[in-house]
Amino acid sequence: MIKLSAALLREIYDHTEASYPHECCGVLIGTTDAAKNHTVHAFRRCKNNNKVRAADRYDMDPLDFMRAEREFENTPWEIIGIYHSHPDHPSRASQTDTDRAVEIMAYAWSYIIVSVQKGKVASAQSWVLSESDNKFYEEPLLTEENSK
């Protein structure tokens, strides 16, 4: 399960809509409890370095990722996942999403995927990569009004 405030989710949506018709991406910052549930406390936008296929691929800027990692290294918060958009496609994990997650062995992370249809958010789902079969499975995405 992943939870975040409605305000944070709205800010992520704003990023995805502003980036349309290209994919955008960013990192989710927060905490993980003993049951492996994530709580997002912040996020950081990351540049999409993919100039050739930006409409259906993202290549997260490694410097942006590293900046986010360093910003929170002496805090109780850490990178707990990634978000990205799917312009004019469903909010389901694609084979490319799966292949990349397996490549970096990101089994403990949540992946929020936002479907943006004709410039407006249509849906959002969160996914977790299973270590046992290298497939994404949907996890509950909960928003809380007062969790920011």
What does each model-identified segment do?
Residues 1-79, 88-148:
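Conserved beta-strand-loop surface patch within small alpha/beta domains used
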Residues 85:
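Residue-level "edge-of-site" marker
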